[in-house]
Amino acid sequence: ELDIQLVVLAGFMHILTEEMVAAYPNAILNVHPALIPSFCGAGYYGLHVHEKALDYGVKVTGATVHFVNEEPDGGPIVLQKAVDILPGDTPEVLQRRVMEQAEWHILPQAVSLFCQGRLSVEGRIVTIKEGE
């Protein structure tokens, strides 16, 4: 039997089964290409997220790392990073900027915090403990 302590979803555009989520409470991290609770939930993945952000006219978007629960993109938020939307952005350009400026930074940071035992979850609130 494996001793799995953390599952990381990056570019995994599928909803996990209830059994999988229940087997790893507060031990599955996902990165979402928006500032949750905006542009998230069932159907909000990939380029669609950035299309919706541009269509809505928001000035800032970003990325969120959160623990996975039974609700798509509904788990407790670990880290977020904002990214400006620039005039002339296309969904593809925005997607790339969000990946490079936010996702690629906060996902490894969240994994590191988890592995150091520095994340505490109470309800929807994630607290980051001071490092030693």
Give residue ranges: language-model regions.
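Donor/substrate-binding cores of folate-linked one-carbon enzymes
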Residues: 6, 10-125
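Glycine-rich phosphate-binding loop signature in dinucleotide/nucleotide-binding domains
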Residues: 1-5
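Phosphate-binding loop/pocket of nucleotide- and phosphate-handling active sites
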Residues: 131-132
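Conserved catalytic region of serine esterases and O-acyltransferases that act on ester linkages
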Residues: 128
